[in-house]
Regions:
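Structural alpha/beta surface segment adjacent to cysteine/selenocysteine redox centers
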Residues: 12, 16-114, 188, 196
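C-terminal cap of thioredoxin/glutaredoxin-like
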Residues: 3-7, 13-33, 106-196
Length: 196
C-alpha cells in the first residue's frame, strides 16, 4: 500500500467504465498509488433517466473508442437489474479479498465484449471462479445486507461529490469524469512526483 489513493467510481452498466478499467487498474504499476474501487448502481437504477439518443450515441462512441484502444466490444449484455446488483455485490467481496481488479476486468469484459448474462448463475459463476473467488462466498455476498449497504454508500459518496455519471476518478481534491480523463489523471500524478 502506498500513501496515495485514487478512488475509482465505476458502473458495470457503463461502457465507458469498461473502457477505463484496464488503464485505471494499471496506474499502480506506473505510480505510487492504490486504486480504491467504488462500484455504483447504474443511473437508470437510481431514478435518473437517460434519453434514448444518448444511449444510441454512447454505443457508437464506445465502439469507436474501443477500436482506438484495441479493446473488444460486442456482443453486449445489458446488466440492468439483477446483473448489475450481482456484479456490484460480488465486486465488494472481491475488494475484501484484493481481487477487485481480476473480477471487475473479467465481468466488464464478459458484459461488454462477450454478451454474457451476468444475471444468471451460469453466466456469473465462471467469471467469479476465473477471478479467484469462491462461488459459494459470492452467492452469500449477493444476498448480504452489509454488502448491499456498502454499494449504497458508494452511490451516496459519488452524489456528495456532485457527480452522477461514471467513471469518476478522485485524487486528492481533484475529480475527473470520463474514461478520456485518464491522461489528465496521469499528468496530476506526474506533477505530484508519484511516477515509479
Amino acid at each position: 500500500m502506498s500513501g496515495e489513493t485514487i478512488e475509482f467510481f465505476f458502473s458495470f452498466r457503463s461502457p465507458y467504465s469498461y473502457l477505463a478499467a484496464p488503464r485505471a487498474f494499471q496506474l499502480p504499476e506506473n505510480y505510487e498509488v492504490d486504486i480504491r474501487f467504488r462500484g455504483v448502481m447504474p443511473m437508470a437504477m437510481r431514478g435518473q433517466s437517460v434519453p434514448s439518443q444518448k444511449r444510441i450515441h454512447t454505443m457508437f462512441d464506445t465502439k469507436r473508442e474501443a477500436n482506438r484502444l484495441g479493446m473488444p466490444f460486442g456482443p453486449v449484455f445489458d446488466p440492468i437489474g439483477d446483473g448489475a446488483v450481482r456484479c456490484l455485490r460480488v465486486s465488494e467481496l472481491a475488494v475484501d479479498q484484493q481481487l477487485e481488479k481480476q473480477f471487475v476486468l473479467a465481468a466488464s469484459r464478459a458484459i461488454w465484449a462477450e454478451g454474457v448474462d451476468v444475471s444468471s448463475d451460469e453466466g456469473l459463476r465462471p467469471i467469479c471462479i476465473a477471478a479467484g473467488l469462491d462461488w459459494h462466498a459470492c452467492l452469500q455476498a449477493i444476498s448480504d445486507p452489509l454488502i448491499e449497504a456498502r454499494v449504497e454508500k458508494n452511490v451516496e459518496d459519488l452524489l456528495e461529490l456532485g457527480q452522477w455519471g461514471v467513471p469518476v476518478f478522485r485524487f486528492r481534491d481533484q475529480l475527473l469524469w470520463g474514461q478520456d480523463r485518464i491522461e489528465d489523471l496521469e499528468r496530476l500524478l506526474d506533477a505530484a512526483g508519484l511516477r515509479r
